[in-house]
């Protein structure tokens, strides 16, 4: 059994750590509320621009490069969204695992994978493994800003527009010399953590480009719902100036850019929730450990007192016996 001083030192150390984890838990909780508020604030714009795109899609030819799957694609960009800070449980590990699965699948399909990373933890992870990263952006994982995420958003859109046979212009954050042109790609995938609830966050893969045909599905589902409800709503007839194809050309990049920014916002909420859960678990474990150590310390203290009493009684008995013999 450890001596009493060692046990008390351990209790003080655990209590000190507990204060840190509790503070981190409270900070993460407040950040979750803020992050959820930002996600909710961005939702109306995203919904409206999607409605406009639905109208444009129904009136245009839908023959747009950002909507069309390219035959014989050669290169696929994968953006891995990680955190800038640790103490978030399995948040980053799960994303890295999901990204590895995606990269393996793309390689089996014949694509050359071009990896991009956001977040210091992702940069450090791939650097330690000596895996090449074509571009990295850090400093905004907990509080994404529209301007701070500009370069990564524009590069992914420009790189896809250029195709694997063309080149895109250099942007800050890319792992090449300034001014050098960058080879484009034919697909863009984003691996990030989806915020499901305060207790659940899961890594997901989202194909950013080409845009998956969810617009037509959404229109069909809403139409089926209206029929099942017995409603016969007449959709308004819009006129587009100059024409639907031109407007689609202008709005699609904005839609994709906004979609990627929404992913950063959701990942920020998931990061804070994951950190809050990890810190709460650490705080609870520290509380239990202090209870166990205190129980052991009390037993050690009781044993020490018992031993001291025994020694005193024994000593007194010895002195008493010595006096009688005299």
UniProtKB/Swiss-Prot annotation:
One of its GO terms (cellular component) is plasma membrane. InterPro entries: ATP_synth_F1_ATPase_gsu, ATP_synth_F1_gsu, ATP_synth_F1_gsu_CS. GO terms for molecular function: ATP binding; proton-transporting ATP synthase activity, rotational mechanism. Keywords: ATP synthesis, Cell membrane, CF(1), Hydrogen ion transport, Ion transport, Membrane, Transport. Gene3D superfamilies: 3.40.1380.10, ATP synthase, gamma subunit, helix hairpin domain (1.10.287.80). It is a peripheral membrane protein. Transmembrane segments: none annotated. One of its GO terms (biological process) is proton motive force-driven plasma membrane ATP synthesis. It is found in: Cell membrane. Coiled coil: none annotated. HAMAP family: ATP_synth_gamma_bact. Belongs to the ATPase gamma chain family. Produces ATP from ADP in the presence of a proton gradient across the membrane. The gamma chain is believed to be important in regulating ATPase activity and the flow of protons through the CF(0) complex. PANTHER family: ATP SYNTHASE GAMMA CHAIN, ATP SYNTHASE SUBUNIT GAMMA, MITOCHONDRIAL. F-type ATPases have 2 components, CF(1) - the catalytic core - and CF(0) - the membrane proton channel. CF(1) has five subunits: alpha(3), beta(3), gamma(1), delta(1), epsilon(1). CF(0) has three main subunits: a, b and c. NCBIfam families: ATPsyn_F1gamma (TIGR01146), PRK05621.1-2 (NF004145). This is ATP synthase gamma chain. It comes from Corynebacterium efficiens (strain DSM 44549 / YS-314 / AJ 12310 / JCM 11189 / NBRC 100395). The gene is atpG.
